[in-house]
Amino acid sequence: DASANAGGTVKLIGSSVGGAVTADNGTIETENTNVVNGASVLNGGKLKLKNGTVSGGIKTDAASTSDVVMDRAGASLQGDVSGEGKMDVTLSNGGSWKGSSAGSGETKVKVESDGTWTGASMNSSTDVDLRGKWQQTSNSKVRKLVSTKGTLDKTDSVSGTTDIGHFGGEMSLIYAHDKTNPTKVLGGGTFIAAADAGSTVNMITDNAGLDTNSKKAADKNKVSEALNALAGKLQYTGYKNGERNLKGKLQIAEGLTSSSAGLRTETLSFKGDGQGYLDYMPAKDPEKPDKPSKPEIETGDYETSIMSSTRSALTSSILVWRNDMNDMYKRMGDLRIGAESGLWARVYGGRISYDAHNAYMKDSYWAAQVGMDKRLASGWHVGGAFGYNDGSATYRYGGKGDPKLYTLAAYATRVSEDGQYVDIIAKVGKLSNKFTAYNKYSAPALRNYVEGKYDTYGYGISAEYGKKIRMGKGFVTPQAELTWSRLSSDSFAAAAPSGESMRVNQSSVNSLIGRLGVVAGVESDKGNFYAKASLFHEFDGDGHILFSEPGKTGKRSSFSLKDTWAEIALGGNYYLSPRSMIYADFTKSFGGDYKVDWRINAGIRFSF
């Protein structure tokens, strides 16, 4: 057991407490601690959870006001809140509560945007401030519910009815329906006795059994009937008393490639008794022309969130390939005039990101490359290299990817007596990305994802020219580089856990990047230190993706990676001996949609 009395504080860190926790006007803080096998008693005290679980519930006495705070992703209260005292429950920073408001005292539940409450309110003196998610598990009644874009999830088969004495704000209300009969919406009704002016309820159900893209009258009517059935789950009892403060929106959630279908906010109607309904005119097929049905159904974004998440995964693959094409300084360091044949190796890593045109990705990676070259009598170094790049990518809505790249390269480099150099490299590579792409919904009934694997080959050639101009112990090297590369097309299936799948056909993508740069530094017999500034421009980078589901019209998404950005690098070369050199640099980009958040490169070269 643990207890805190008379304003005292007890901190439980990295332990397990068996039995009750008691706070009589004191504070109990837990961190990495589990409290099990007993209800906690708060008589005017405070229980604050950090990365721990309290099970067994919370009790309060009649003359007290107590607080329970779960303010970490690992903080969880499991059990009911009961008793006659006042209770404030706060869920924030990923904190969660699995239990019910079951007492008789005034209870205030605050669910922040990243908090989750799974349970019910059996106490009519409960007020709810909903910014996150409430997943209802049985019949519930609350005195007041104020929502700031929060979600009431009633997709559980036993969610029951919801009685709200007074409602204010904007809330998403989610229901499930029979997948074989989409017009049968499951779960109990939601009853709102009164509402603040301008309040809105957005009612959503999934798209199973519905085709929102279809132009057929029967399919259109099924969508309308499903929306009407969804509307019927809302009962605005204040309406029959003349109140007109509540508005609603009805929506069929998007699918893999099917866009969402919704109605304008003001078109949700209420019957005389306050029950919601959709006033619509049945559609007819084109061979039987009629006036357009009103209200017109609004279609959501052409590109669904799963489509955009999948495109983000493919975009990350393209950028991984593009990022791996690099200049001579990164690959071999600063070759001296007359450098001999050599063997070199380097490791490099960093993070690249992209957030534009409804595509988002971040890829943290590490890579290694080894190469060998021979100096010819003409002064040219010709050689080859093998490389491996292993990444870990994240996408919007919790998506993730595992991009991998294997490359073979052949290069020719010449450094002249007057400081001029030419570097030409041709590269081929095998690129793969096993990814998971999620949709935008957080409610379990609407949450969906696909898994796929993008597998293709890349080709590229780069030509770089520069001239080192020496100025005493310093030097300046203007540079120009042109890089062309191509990723081949690929076609693959992306499957969802529900059994749905979509075909993804990615076009080939060409890239043409120009770079103008300048290197300035100081040097000695042992090496040099330099700063490099470069300006890049992507002249091409256009492509498209065709998404298709069985029995549905395919959708085409086009994209362009045209962009301009700058990079700044700091680096140096150091000769360990006349036949060995180490080199390293740090790079960061500025401007543009494509960003090199950071990159570190280090290598070693041996001459023989």
Mark where each language-model region is.
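Outer membrane beta-barrel translocator domains of Type V secretion systems
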Residues: 294-472, 586-587, 592, 597, ...
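Residue-level detector of the transmembrane beta-barrel scaffold of outer-membrane proteins
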Residues: 20, 57, 80, 342-346, ...
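Outer membrane beta-barrel transmembrane domains
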Residues: 409, 502-608
